[in-house]
Amino acid sequence: MDPNMNNLLKWSIENSTSARQAGNSNGTGPAPASRSNLNPEMLSALFGGPSDADLMKAAMEALHSDEVDLENKMIAFDNFEQLIESIDNANNLEPLGLWTPLVELLKHEEAEMRRMAAWCIGTAVQNNEKAQDKLIVFNVLPTLVAMSTSDPAPAARKKAVYAISSGVRNYQPAMDEFVKHLPEGYTSGEKIDAADMEAIDALLDKLRAHPSEVSA
C-alpha cells in the first residue's frame, strides 16, 4: 500500500473511532483529543482527493492485511460499504480489480468478515443490473447459496440471503443461476420469474427458515 494512502486510512480509522466515542459520551467527560498529525502529503491526498477509487482500494488492502486487526477491518468494511452505495463506485469494482478480493472474503475464517463481505456484495448489486451480472461472471452465487444454507453464523447467513435477494431480483440470468445451485427441496424444479417478487420472497423465506443441518 502506498505510504500516504496507508497513513490516510489510519487517520480515517482513528477519527471514525473518535467520532463514535464522542457520540457515546452524551456530552459528558472530556472531548477526544483532536488528531492533527496529517503531514502535507496526506493533506494533499485528503483535500485534493483521495478519489473514491483510492479509498476503495485502500480499504480492500486493509481487509486483506495481516497487520490490521479485526476491529479496524470492520471500520474499513463499513467505509467500503458506504462507498459502493454509489452505483458508479459499485460499477467501478471490476475495473479496479476489487470483485475477486471481495468475493474471497466470503470464505474468511472470521464470521464477521464473511457477514460484511456478503453485505457489501448485496449493496453493490442492489438495483444495479451491471453489477448483478458480476455475480455470474465471478461465480459468486454458489458461495452465497452455501453461506445461506450452511454457514455456522446466523448473522452471516442472513447477509448472504440479503446479497442473493439483491442480486436476483429483476435479473433473470442471476435468478436462474441461483436456483441451479439450491439444495434439493427448495424448489419444485419450476422456473422462477425474476420479476415475480412474491415467488422470490417465498423462496428466500425458505432459506431463512430452513438452514441445512450443517449449520445446526
UniProtKB/Swiss-Prot annotation:
Family matches, as Pfam families: Fes1, HEAT_EZ
Entry GO MF terms: adenyl-nucleotide exchange factor activity
ARM repeat ranges, renumbered to this chain: 27-68, 87-126, 129-169, 185-216
GO biological process terms on file: cytoplasm protein quality control by the ubiquitin-proteasome system; regulation of translation
Top-level taxon: Eukaryota
Alphabetic keyword roster: Cytoplasm, Repeat, Translation regulation
SUPFAM superfamilies for the chain: ARM repeat
Gene3D superfamilies per UniProt: Leucine-rich Repeat Variant
Main location: cytoplasm
Region of interest called Disordered, as start-end residue ranges on this chain: 19-38
Annotated compartments: Cytoplasm
GO cellular component term of the entry, any: cytosol
InterPro entries named in the record: ARM-like, ARM-type_fold, Hsp70_NEF-Inhibitors, Nucleotide_exch_fac_Fes1
Family: Belongs to the FES1 family.
Summary of the function given for this chain in its UniProt record: Functions as a nucleotide exchange factor (NEF) for Hsp70 chaperones which accelerates the release of ADP. Required for fully efficient Hsp70-mediated folding of proteins.
PANTHER family: HSP70-BINDING PROTEIN 1, PROTEIN FOLDING REGULATOR
Protein name per the record: Hsp70 nucleotide exchange factor fes1
Organism: Aspergillus fumigatus (strain ATCC MYA-4609 / CBS 101355 / FGSC A1100 / Af293) (Neosartorya fumigata)
